[in-house]
Swiss-Prot record:
It comes from Haemophilus influenzae (strain PittEE). It holds the Pfam family UPF0114. It comes from the Bacteria. It is a multi-pass membrane protein. Keywords: Cell membrane, Membrane, Transmembrane, Transmembrane helix. Belongs to the UPF0114 family. NCBIfam families: HI0507. This is UPF0114 protein CGSHiEE_00455. Disulfide bonds: none annotated. The chain crosses the membrane at residues 30-50, 68-88, 124-144, 150-170.
């Protein structure tokens, strides 16, 4: 005798929903070209660093100490932007696309063992403040050649970065303490 199974009225809906969920989940791979583009950008900054260092070395005898300091600050700026690119590339890929699976690699940076969106946001904001600080140093070393209005706007922008980072850290602290309260 044939057994009557109840017909699931939502079976077709569940199947379509599952397909949509798979498409949405797979869409994260569309970010891969963006991260590869950041690697190309990192190569451009590596070239810029080598070129800047070479120019500093071959022209050192013709430079005064302020010009040398500006050249060094420019190199530090390039390094900090390169570090920012590495953090965004590795952290973003690991958080949003797929795990890198480098847990046992001897050269794995320490911060990768606990990378998450919150850690990445804090590291990014600190990097931006560091880059902004380098720009501020360059501005003040070269203050005699800078319009006062430009210096004021750079200072205000830097203060804005600082306030944003403090607000972000405070918000993360509140969220962390709220989510870890014992009842």
């Amino acid at each position: 005798m044939k057994e009557n199974k109840p017909v699931d009225p939502y079976a077709k809906y569940n199947e379509q929903s599952n397909i949509i969920a798979k498409i949405i989940f797979a869409s994260r791979w569309l970010q891969v070209p963006i991260y590869l583009g950041l690697i190309v950008t990192l190569a451009i900054y590596s070239y810029k660093f080598i070129k800047g260092l070479w120019e500093l070395v071959i022209n050192v005898n013709d430079m005064d100490s302020n010009t040398i300091m500006l050249g060094v600050l420019n190199l530090i700026d390039v390094v900090m932007i390169a570090n920012l690119l590495v953090m965004v590339t590795i952290g973003g890929y690991e958080i949003f696309v797929s795990k890198l699976r480098t847990r046992n690699h001897p050269d794995q940076p320490e911060w990768m063992s606990h990378v998450n969106a919150t850690v990445l946001k804090v590291k990014l904001s600190m990097s931006i403040i560091g880059i902004s600080s380098i720009h501020m140093l360059q501005t003040f070393v070269n203050a005699s050649n800078m319009p006062e209005k430009t210096m004021m706007w750079q200072l205000l922008l830097h203060l804005g970065f600082l306030v944003s980072a403090i607000a972000l850290a405070y918000t993360d602290k509140i969220l962390y303490s709220t989510s870890h309260k014992t009842h």
